[in-house]
Swiss-Prot record:
Subcellular location field: Secreted
Pfam families: Antimicrobial_6
Organism: Oiketicus kirbyi (Bagworm moth)
Tissues in which the protein is found: Hemolymph.
Biological processes, Gene Ontology terms: defense response to bacterium; defense response to fungus; innate immune response; killing of cells of another organism
Paired cysteines (S-S): 10-24, 14-36, 25-42
Name of protein: Psychimicin
Predominant subcellular localization, coarse grouping: secreted
Signal peptide: none
Keyword list, A-Z: Antibiotic, Antimicrobial, Disulfide bond, Fungicide, Immunity, Innate immunity, Secreted
Length: 45
């Protein structure tokens, strides 16, 4: 099972700090950020 989900609106924070990336994921209803390879990927809750 893939627990990552693409969150395109968070792509713009990929160059920022990890806490900012986590916050963007949370703002979109996810747990925290996984990776920005190919765009923001957040872990599902």
């Amino acid at each position: 099972i893939n627990n990552w989900v693409r969150v395109p609106p968070c792509d713009q924070v990929c160059s920022r700090t990890n806490p900012e990336k986590d916050e963007c994921c949370r703002a979109h209803g996810h747990a925290f950020h996984a990776t920005c390879s190919g765009g923001m990927q957040c872990y599902r809750r």
